[in-house]
Regions:
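Membrane-embedded helix-loop-helix hairpins and adjacent transmembrane boundary segments
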Residues: 1-370
């Protein structure tokens, strides 16, 4: 996709996309590595550092060999395994925990007031600090993630739209079903430490089901998250072996291309692992950061595909650049300082400020030319 941006606009606009997509790939790799290793630590007692190394190494080894083909196979395997877990584990937990009444009792969350906060100050805080970035980040996700463009280009043109719609429904049910385990935890009165909230499902399963269920969940998590890791390896290999390679090398040499791609994979593995070792790092902070970043290119990318004549090179470069440089740091500061105004403002500037600036500068630029 960045190649399309280069041809349509310029190299410097392409650079914005490459930097954004590399940061996103690194964060996506890190969050899944952290989620998997932390879950395995809870269920097995093995320090998460060791499991993180193992997960990254396994995904790296077979990605070196087969690349994008491996991601197709592992994604298919992942969806089968995860759906098996949804069908077997979730109903079993609900039944043993006391049935649907326990789920209903947990709808209000640990405090019991979650279902009644609409219209209150607390609802505004939840929306400003989490809801806005999470919702908009998910909407804009595919537009700022190189792995989605890879999948689109790997599918026959006539099947792209249908494939993405069907895939969304197949996967969309999974987080809804797995989310019921969180309500079970709240409804049954389980006390889960704040630093372990990200592994709630694993704790709930271990609390209500026998050891075999936890072992299967370990396998499910490992298989599912390793599949995501290899997707990011494939994504970064595409960028380093194609986009970055083509910037500095005019002659295409297959061996050198593969070398660039593999170096990119290794660097991604190291960077992602180092992020997981940051003291106090949480899944939530990583997710919200890259959700805001990738959503900043969402609307400009959509317009560039559908109505490219509305945009100019300067509009794309300065519009997205200014919005990202101002909005993302503002959002990060707001999260670290626990400042609601900064958090919400950063989200809005990065996402909506981006498209407003892109269109405004493009319009001004075209007037100057005419």
């Amino acid at each position: 996709f960045s190649g399309f941006i280069k041809e349509k606009f310029s190299k410097r606009v392409q650079n914005i996309y490459i930097v954004e997509m590399i940061i996103l790939a690194t964060c996506a790799f890190a969050i899944n590595l952290l989620a998997g290793s932390k879950t395995l630590e809870v269920l097995t007692g093995i320090p998460f550092t060791y499991t993180a190394i193992a997960m990254a190494a396994i995904a790296l080894l077979y990605s070196f060999r087969t690349g994008l083909k491996a991601t197709v196979i592992t994604e298919m395997f992942k969806i089968i395994v995860v759906w098996t877990g949804v069908i077997l584990i979730v109903p079993a937990v609900i039944y043993i925990a006391g049935g649907w009444e326990t789920v209903q009792a947990g709808l209000g969350g640990m405090r019991g007031d979650g279902a009644s906060i609409i219209g209150t100050e607390r609802a505004w805080v939840v929306f400003a600090t989490f809801g806005a970035a999470a919702f908009l980040g998910h909407l804009g996700g595919p537009w700022g993630d190189n792995s989605f463009y890879q999948r689109a280009f790997a599918i026959q043109k006539k099947s792209v739209f249908k494939s993405f719609v069907i895939a969304a429904f197949i996967f969309g049910i999974i987080p809804i079903m797995m989310g019921l385990l969180g309500y079970i935890g709240a409804g049954s009165g389980m006390e889960i430490p704040g630093n372990m909230v990200g592994t709630t499902n694993a704790i709930v399963i271990a609390n209500f089901l026998p050891a075999w269920a936890s072992l299967f969940f370990v396998f499910l998590v490992f298989a599912g998250l390793v599949a995501i890791l290899d997707s990011q390896f494939s994504s970064i290999a595409n960028m380093t072996g194609h986009d970055i390679y083509n910037k500095y090398k005019k002659k295409v040499d297959d061996k050198t291309v593969i070398k660039y791609a593999r170096v990119g994979m290794v660097v991604l593995a190291i960077a992602g692992f180092l992020i997981t070792q940051i003291p106090g790092i949480t899944l939530l902070y990583i997710f919200l950061f890259f959700a805001t970043l990738r959503a900043a290119v969402w609307l400009p990318s959509l317009i560039a595909i559908v109505k490219p004549k509305l945009l100019s090179e300067q509009g794309m470069f300065y519009g997205m650049g200014i919005a990202i440089i101002i909005g993302v740091p503002m959002f990060v500061y707001g999260k670290l300082a626990k400042s609601l105004p900064y958090t919400l403002s950063g989200t809005l500037v990065a996402i909506f400020g981006s498209v407003v600036l892109v269109l405004a500068i493009s319009k001004w630029n075209k007037k100057q030319i005419s």
